[in-house]
């Protein structure tokens, strides 16, 4: 059903010619971001075309600035993440291909849908959580006939540290089994939008996409991702779907970050991250420039900013809760059971910290009054009998940490 044919032949061996590749496991001596910046600068100075993958947009901007400051040969280091304007992203991609840009600090925006390969080195600052994602990022390294290097830098969390101590798990284990729930609207929605860019959607498409098609189409129309004309739905934007939306999940309408002095759109923040990224008083980083948020207007999908050098950076403080809506399946597991079903996730930004950009010391904590956001999705939970918890001597905090 996935590809429209009944019989397929499995190809599970890679027989393509590949140059030699060294994989290095790295325990940071300083902080992860400091070591990543220093290593990228060293690689650039040695003439290596480099990609460094990091875990968040903010870290990408910070590492890019610090790496550029340490380059001594005139090489160019740039950040690459979602939220850049399409032309900015295309310029960076072209710069990498031509050699005008020597290194990029990227989020997984560069992991998907971008034809960039043949790098001399890939630095992965923090295990991405899945072997498939690790090897996809590592696969960017390797020019024809030239030896390449992949460096995995471990974070301080238990999973990264365990992998560094047991590297055989990286090299001898097969990638994870793909878990697919195509009817999940938060997964199906972005792919329908991308399909609509290629050709309009119509009722007959239910034979391909299944009975959830109409429900997800209605959601996309409400969010103004698609426009309906009669029984057909169209992608109406000039840019590519891969640039405008997250193909992994549906985040809703993006928030434009606008220069309050000129009216120019500086960048775009996806709706799910906007409260944490462009709340009033936030420092918004974009290609090494610092912008201070003057106003955040979620109903108008925009934030007004001005260029500044405030001497601090901001860290949002938020709270979240999960409520089980419906249990669909249950399986015994140890003394308890594991269940799956529908859950409701509620999150709210409560305030933010201002931290010194040099020493990282906390200046102060500022409270915010922000709306809470609720999303219904699929979830998995593990239930342990109270008697077992009491016998182990675990309070609520220790139990959450143990899980």
Please report, for each region that a protein language model flagged, where it lies by residue.
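Helicase motor core with emphasis on the C-terminal RecA-like subdomain
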Residues: 1-201, 205-242, 249-252, 262
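Extended Lys/Arg-rich polyanion-binding regions
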Residues: 147-150, 156-173, 186, 191-203, ...
